[in-house]
Amino acid sequence: MAYFGKFHPLLVHFPIALVFAAAAGELVVIVTRRQAWHTVAVANIRAGAAMGVVTAITGWLFASSPLVDASPSLEWHRWVGMAGAAAAIGAALLSWRLHVPSRHSAFVYRFTLFVTALLVAIAGHLGGTLVWGASFFQP
């Protein structure tokens, strides 16, 4: 099983991009009122949630391999990443309720989607510091 964990660095970029694309698409809907972008957002968050599950599984496998040293940074990355994956699943599930027009449903979906994007950004940053070090951006 540890072999599949080695795919985490490859797979992790897909759900990040999909969640960010979903959030960007929904922002376009809010700003321009063009509902076609909502379809883009929903497709991306659903795909991002599915890929997030696969990526989280490979991340857990990778973290338990002898290649990775346990650290507080790893634990933060692990749990913020899990929260992001769970939030993505929540946003994807909430997107199915949007076929019935409701301002409340739209607000809850969008709030969950934007929180998901924030969690994914934080988890991605933490993962980057695990790979490149905390001083990567320092001159």
Kindly give the residue locations of the regions a language model identified.
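Polytopic transmembrane helical bundles with strong interfacial aromatic enrichment
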Residues: 1-139
